[in-house]
């Protein structure tokens, strides 16, 4: 999908609810305040939020190429000439505490393409004034690549067994809102890949953190950071980087739009946590967006 089609698809989806809103009484929109995180995702990773019982949500995510640096700049239209990754997913709230989702992403090709993913999410605690000081969810998911097997045995995409195509993650998402405008999250994550190269680790631990700052009734600023703890002898810091993202969120009843900048190319925990190699300080960050529609 080229830039023009991607951009105008996003523009159409973003503008359409404005026309619907003209016939809607703002006082009838059932917002609950305060909101810790308004979407089930922050930027790259999951948030504390889950879908209400019986609610479906379709998500479309795009991630373009480097804004500047060696692979960016005006010659590549600041990354818009490239589509780093794209993901389409459908999610469902089984009840008010439990949800699940399935998706398919293109993959960055570094190292994987053609990825299927799924997750389960359960709300253990919910922040309530006077009784519960924070919210907590448990999330577990996996991804499977069905890309063509490499003929080179030294490649990470050479899969001796079908199980080597799998990767898993489990995380505990802790979040707290401080009044109506500011929220913080802490996200310890354990990730395991069944097959890696000799200079990598199968199991990684990462500690994610994020905040949300509501700036109006419809807009919020988001930031997210994942620090990966690893053996630097096998995963040198000069090559692998930690994922950092900044975003502007626009939310309406039924829709959620996020425009973001991040140094991660891949979508999903099994991709952006272990395979981020771009450096913000070298201009190696890229524009992306997410459109989510509940129905």
Locate the predicted segments by residue.
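Cleavable N-terminal export/targeting peptides
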Residues: 1-34
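A mid-sequence, solvent-exposed acidic-amphipathic segment
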Residues: 181-230
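Transmembrane beta-barrel domains of Gram-negative outer membranes and organellar outer membranes
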Residues: 22-160, 165-171, 175-191, 213, ...
């Amino acid at each position: 999908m080229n830039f023009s089609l991607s951009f105008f698809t996003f523009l159409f989806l973003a503008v359409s609810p404005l026309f619907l809103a003209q016939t809607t009484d703002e006082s009838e929109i059932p917002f609950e305040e305060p909101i810790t995180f308004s979407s089930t995702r922050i930027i790259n990773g999951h948030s504390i939020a889950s879908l209400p019982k019986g609610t479906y949500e379709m998500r479309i995510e795009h991630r373009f190429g480097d804004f500047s640096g060696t692979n960016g700049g005006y010659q590549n239209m600041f990354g818009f000439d490239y589509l780093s990754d794209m993901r389409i997913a459908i999610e469902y709230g089984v009840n008010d505490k439990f949800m699940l989702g399935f998706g398919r992403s293109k993959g960055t090709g570094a190292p994987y393409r053609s990825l299927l993913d799924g997750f389960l999410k359960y709300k253990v605690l919910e922040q309530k004034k006077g009784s519960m000081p924070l919210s907590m969810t448990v999330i577990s998911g996996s991804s499977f690549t069905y890309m063509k097997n490499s003929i080179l045995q030294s490649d990470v995409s050479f899969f001796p067994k079908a199980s080597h195509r799998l990767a898993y993650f489990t995380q505990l998402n802790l979040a707290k809102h401080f009044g109506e405008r500011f929220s913080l999250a802490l996200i310890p994550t354990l990730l395991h890949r069944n097959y890696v190269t000799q200079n990598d680790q199968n199991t990684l631990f990462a500690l994610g953190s994020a905040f949300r700052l509501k700036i109006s009734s419809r807009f919020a600023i988001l930031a997210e950071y994942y620090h990966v703890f690893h053996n630097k002898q096998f995963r040198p810091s000069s090559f692998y980087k930690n994922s950092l993202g900044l975003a502007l969120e626009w939310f309406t009843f039924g829709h959620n739009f996020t425009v973001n900048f991040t140094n991660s190319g891949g979508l999903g925990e099994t991709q952006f946590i272990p395979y981020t190699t771009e450096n913000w300080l070298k201009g190696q960050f890229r524009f992306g967006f997410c459109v989510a529609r509940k129905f």
